Amino acid sequence: MTSRRVSSRRKSRTNKSLFISLLLLFNFDSLVSESSGTESLIDKDKILNSMDWLENQDFDWYKANVPFLETPDKEIDATYYYRWELVTRHICYGSPNSGYLLTEFANRPFWSGAYGAIACPSGHQFYEIRWMHNPHVARDYLRYWFRTKGAQPRKYSSWLADSAWAVHQVHPNEQFILDLFPDLLKNFQGWEERHWVKEMNMFWQTGHDDGMEFNINSRQTKDILRGDRAFRPTFNSYMWADATALAKIAALKKDRKLE
């Protein structure tokens, strides 16, 4: 009986975490949109004061930057605002030339790029920060990958074109995304040149560079950290997402060859 209860609690936590992820992944304007009047019904101070365990107590930042959410489930609410607290821990201002970016590790390990950014989590980060009221951070971070010396957009798997399109869906700005298009296209072509296998119609990637070091595949090779080349479903799905996003952006600029 005890094991069933533990299993049920774990399943409940998993479902709640999945709910938060889906909330940030898809459009949830109907729940949090200020324009619809929903957010005005939420007592922001009351919610934030109930989150006294948050390490970042700069409540003015939350009120100025993020959509507010209130549900009947306090665990979902706590998870949601904790996710935003994590964003505050990793937003970094690199320089006047690079602007804002996000780090993966607070201590900026040696394998990170300029100012501590790493491409591996970038797609997840973009899908969260795109919901900030002001798109300034997301747009700086997109530009960072292509216009900052020392950025490493292809050191790890990422889906930067899809991320750019995702930001555009929340904060439409054709001028910005069309200006970024040549960089996004060049980045995709860089992956093609190095990883595309024409005979298989697929991209190869190693587990380490796919953000999954020391995996079951790599442990069957001599290099247990990196592993061997493989046609990984993850990486191929990222490339498909980027190709789809590039086609959508090409349609905006009426580029029939790339659309």
Task: Enumerate the language-model features and the residues they cover.
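Active-site neighborhood of glycoside hydrolase catalytic domains
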Residues: 233-259
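Solvent-exposed loop and edge beta-strand segments that line ligand/cofactor-binding
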Residues: 37, 51-54, 68, 104-119, ...
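N-terminal secretory signal peptides that target proteins for export/translocation
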Residues: 1-14
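Aromatic-lined, polymer-binding surfaces characteristic
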Residues: 118, 131, 135-138, 147-169, ...
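Low-complexity, Ser/Thr/Pro/Gly-enriched N-terminal "stalk/linker" regions
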Residues: 34-117
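Alpha-helical support elements that line or immediately flank enzyme active sites
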Residues: 107-142
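Bacterial N-terminal signal peptides
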Residues: 20-29
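Active-site acid/base region of carbohydrate-active enzymes
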Residues: 70-96, 115, 119-120, 170-234, ...
